[in-house]
Each structure stands twice: as structure tokens, then as C-alpha cells.
Design a protein with these regions (language model features):
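Conserved hydrophobic beta-strand within the GNAT/NAT acetyltransferase core sheet
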Residues: 50-53, 158, 192-196
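A conserved beta-strand-loop-helix scaffold within acyl/acetyltransferase catalytic domains
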Residues: 12-15, 120-134, 138-140, 144-162
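Conserved acetyl-CoA-binding loop-helix of GNAT-fold acetyltransferases
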Residues: 29-40, 163, 169-182, 186, ...
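A conserved beta-turn-beta hairpin within the catalytic core of GNAT-like acetyltransferases
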Residues: 9-25, 71-73, 150-159, 168
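Acyl-donor-binding surface of acyltransferase catalytic domains
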Residues: 25-89, 218-222
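A short beta-loop-alpha structural element at the N-terminal edge
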Residues: 90-103
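Conserved active-site alpha-helix within GNAT-family acetyltransferase domains
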Residues: 56-72, 170, 174, 186, ...
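Helix-loop element at the rim of GNAT/NAT acetyltransferase active sites that forms part
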Residues: 105-117
Length: 227
């Protein structure tokens, strides 16, 4: 839903498809008072907690002035794209008309409830950059894993990667990473950036094995109780 007050504007959506009591709020323009008003509006509609987008600490001041506090933390990885990646281990294809609802089923199975983003979150990920693609690996004709990759100003973002647990440990995630790097290079990106949960050691090993370097900076999701 679009929230406006004069010049200020924000977008709000459910944090995921499992609960309406958690909401994600993305500020387009405005200050801490407007953020507070958005939290109040959401609380009146049953939202118990409002979460910010993931952001570095130097961009969080307006949220903290509105009463938001640290909630979740993400580590950031970066890869130089000058060298081509090894070939994927599976056939990876760009989906010309991805179905967010179908992808959300895989996403829900791949992540625990805290990190699920639901259909609306996947739509946001696809629209986060001017150029993007959904890459998929199919097993027996059914999508077993997907990646959402985008590019803007020569920087590529691996927005989301999920593999159905029934097909885990078969190299599908590795294939999607390599195909995402190849897509990014073909679309003019010079670096790729991604983030993941600090406790996701399997993902960390995969990314580091594929040439990603962990940066010192971390991203934080902030939260404020809505009611």
C-alpha cells in the first residue's frame, strides 16, 4: 500500500505471506515524523511490528529518530566480475514471465519464517533495479531453485537465491550463482553485491568458494512495535 502525507511517501507491505502482524515499510521520501505516522496507521490496522529495509548504519538515523531499534543483521559480500565464472553445473534459464506466487512456495520452503519475504517481497526484489532477471533451474520440468539478479550503474545485485530443500546439496545454488554472475557481466556490471544471514554458514561457504569477499560493513533491519 502507498502511504502519503504531503510531499512524503512510503510503501508498506506484509513482511511475508504467513502473518499480517509484521509489516515492511520502505521510505521513499520524508522524515522521522512521517515514519512515525506510518507506524501509527499500520498499528490501527492490526500490525504489531514494523520493519525497515536492510540498510547500513550511516543511513539509519531517520529511522532511529522515529524510535526504530536493531532487529536483524546481514553480512555483505562482493565479487569483482572481471573474470568469467566457471560454467554452471545445471541448465539455468531466464524465466520470461516469472510467477511470484510459485516462487514464494520455494522461498518459504528454503528459509525459516524470520527470513521469508513472500510474494510481495519477491515482486519488490524483481523491481529493485531497472534491469533484472529471474533465473531458474528445473528438475523434471519443475522449478527446483531460482535467483533474482539485477543491475544498476554497473553494479549487480543478487537479490534472492532459494533452492527447494528437496533438491538441496546437488549444486543447484552454485549453478544459480554462476549463471547470475554471467548474466551480470553480459549486462555491463563490474561488481556483484549480495547479503546473507550471519548464521547461514552454508551460503557463506558457497559464496566464498565462488570468489565473493566478505565486507566489513553489515546491514541492519530495524524494527518498531506498532501497538
Amino acid at each position: 500500500v502507498k502511504l502519503r502525507r504531503g510531499w512524503a511517501a512510503a510503501q508498506a507491505r506484509p513482511w511475508n505471506d504467513q502473518t499480517v502482524e509484521l509489516a515492511s515499510l520502505r521510505l521513499e521520501r520524508g522524515g522521522d515524523r512521517f515514519i512515525g505516522a506510518c507506524v501509527g496507521w499500520l498499528a490501527e490496522r492490526g500490525v504489531k511490528r514494523v520493519l525497515s529495509p536492510a540498510m547500513p548504519d550511516d543511513q539509519s538515523s531517520v529511522w532511529r529518530r522515529a524510535g526504530f531499534e536493531n532487529h536483524l543483521e546481514l553480512v555483505v559480500y562482493e565479487k569483482d566480475l572481471r573474470q568469467p565464472p566457471p560454467p554452471p553445473l545445471h541448465r539455468v534459464a531466464a524465466d520470461p514471465s516469472p510467477d511470484p506466487a510459485a516462487l514464494a512456495v520455494i522461498d518459504d520452503r528454503a528459509f525459516d519464517p524470520t527470513w521469508r519475504i513472500g510474494k510481495a517481497g519477491l515482486v519488490d526484489a524483481m523491481a529493485a533495479t531497472p534491469t533484472s532477471a529471474v533465473l531458474t533451474v528445473r528438475v523434471d520440468g519443475v522449478v527446483a531453485g531460482f535467483a533474482i539478479v539485477g543491475e544498476m550503474a554497473a553494479v549487480s545485485y543478487l537479490q534472492r537465491l532459494a533452492v527447494d530443500p528437496d533438491h538441496a546439496r546437488r549444486g543447484i545454488g552454485r549453478s544459480l550463482v554462476r549463471a547470475s554472475v554471467d548474466w551480470a557481466r553480459r549486462h555491463g556490471a563490474r561488481t556483484m553485491v549480495l547479503n546473507t544471514q550471519p548464521e547461514n554458514l552454508a551460503a557463506a561457504r558457497l559464496y566464498e568458494d565462488e570468489g565473493f569477499v566478505r565486507l566489513g560493513a553489515r546491514l541492519r533491519v530495524l524494527a518498531k512495535e506498532g501497538a
